[in-house]
Design a protein with these regions (language model features):
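Sec-dependent bacterial lipoprotein signal peptides
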Residues: 1-19
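Cystatin/cathelin-like cysteine-protease inhibitor module
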Residues: 19-114
Length: 114
């Protein structure tokens, strides 16, 4: 019985950590869209936060060049990136984008319109 309690507590803590991570990513993306892209958006949905190691420096540079000029992106620290996809409305247009966040999820490293 004691093992079951420990496992239950561990799973509960893991769930709370994952929820906090999801909320942190959403907040960073919303701030980025409002401040850097200067779009007043209504958010429809977000995917779950996930990790990737496939974002090489050349891919990040290419993604940054596709977007508007003058955007301040977060610095990439390490190889791992987090990403989240968002569907949102701007002026009655439905947009979809993938946002790549630094590992600590403090800022957007790059994004791409889907």
């Amino acid at each position: 019985m004691r093992i079951n309690n420990i496992i239950g507590i561990g799973l509960t803590l893991l769930l709370f950590a994952a929820c906090g991570q999801q909320q942190q990513a959403k907040s960073v993306v919303k701030d980025f869209v409002a401040d850097c892209l200067q779009q007043d958006a209504d958010y429809l949905d977000f995917t779950d936060v996930d990790s990737t190691l496939s974002g090489s420096d050349s891919v990040i540079t290419a993604l940054r060049q596709q977007g508007p000029k003058g955007i301040q992106y977060a610095e990439r620290k390490g190889k791992a990136l987090k990403y989240i996809r968002a569907n949102y409305l701007v002026n009655d247009d439905t947009l979809s984008a993938t946002f790549y966040l630094d590992a600590e999820m403090t800022g957007v490293v790059a994004y791409k319109q889907n």
